[in-house]
Amino acid sequence: MKSYTALLAVAILCLFAAVGVSGKCTKNALAQTGFNKDKYFNGDVWYVTDYLDLEPDDVPKRYCAALAAGTASGKLKEALYHYDPKTQDTFYDVSELQEESPGKYTANFKKVEKNGNVKVDVTSGNYYTFTVMYADDSSALIHTCLHKGNKDLGDLYAVLNRNKDTNAGDKVKGAVTAASLKFSDFISTKDNKCEYDNVSLKSLLTK
């Protein structure tokens, strides 16, 4: 059985290689100029529609992921969900976010049940960082890096959309190109028969 950290890597959109295989994360993921935090963190759900993992040795071929980002009790929060269409396993995590600079965040996470009961609490040295490289009302491009024991586990880029059935548009594709990436290298999650639990996901922002 994979360790919790390996499963968490999937649950937080970081489909990195197996735990223990480290790859330094890029320092060149730049946040969007003029990033509108209120629109991104409005409490609604973002779906992962396409992803690029630069440490792909242990990446599942099919997965579904979504996140809700919002503000609760004056704190920036993120609730994350993963669904494996093959095994039908689900994972939930809740994070409090620290803003390092506009569009750049560090998240200390805990593994929870769908009702918010804690399964694994925040662990020192285990966290993830993410950068919102582009965002508009309906789409976004983010870069994520999972850190275990203060070691990087590699880069993941994800294209998000507010609509789970929408193809990536020209603007977010342009952001991919501007980041010196090729959209053709991204893997789509659209045909994975994804199932989502948006009610639980949104409610976890208050946990």
UniProtKB/Swiss-Prot annotation:
<feature type="disulfide bond">
    <location>
        <begin position="64"/>
        <end position="194"/>
    </location>
</feature>
<dbReference type="InterPro" id="IPR023613">
    <property type="entry name" value="Nitrophorin"/>
</dbReference>
<keyword id="KW-0964">Secreted</keyword>
<feature type="signal peptide">
    <location>
        <begin position="1"/>
        <end position="23"/>
    </location>
</feature>
<dbReference type="InterPro" id="IPR002351">
    <property type="entry name" value="Nitrophorin_domain"/>
</dbReference>
<keyword id="KW-0408">Iron</keyword>
<keyword id="KW-1015">Disulfide bond</keyword>
<comment type="similarity">
    <text>Belongs to the calycin superfamily. Nitrophorin family.</text>
</comment>
<dbReference type="GO" id="GO:0005576">
    <property type="term" value="C:extracellular region"/>
</dbReference>
<protein>
    <recommendedName>
        <fullName>Nitrophorin-1</fullName>
    </recommendedName>
</protein>
<feature type="binding site" description="proximal binding residue">
    <location>
        <position position="82"/>
    </location>
    <ligand>
        <name>heme</name>
    </ligand>
</feature>
<dbReference type="Pfam" id="PF02087">
    <property type="entry name" value="Nitrophorin"/>
</dbReference>
<keyword id="KW-0840">Vasodilator</keyword>
<keyword id="KW-0479">Metal-binding</keyword>
<dbReference type="GO" id="GO:0046872">
    <property type="term" value="F:metal ion binding"/>
</dbReference>
<dbReference type="GO" id="GO:0042311">
    <property type="term" value="P:vasodilation"/>
</dbReference>
<comment type="function">
    <text>Heme-based protein that deliver nitric oxide gas (NO) to the victim while feeding, resulting in vasodilation and inhibition of platelet aggregation. Reversibly binds nitric oxide (NO). Also binds tightly to histamine, which is released by the host to induce wound healing.</text>
</comment>
<keyword id="KW-0732">Signal</keyword>
<dbReference type="GO" id="GO:0051381">
    <property type="term" value="F:histamine binding"/>
</dbReference>
<feature type="disulfide bond">
    <location>
        <begin position="25"/>
        <end position="145"/>
    </location>
</feature>
<keyword id="KW-0349">Heme</keyword>
<dbReference type="GO" id="GO:0070026">
    <property type="term" value="F:nitric oxide binding"/>
</dbReference>
<dbReference type="InterPro" id="IPR012674">
    <property type="entry name" value="Calycin"/>
</dbReference>
<keyword id="KW-0838">Vasoactive</keyword>
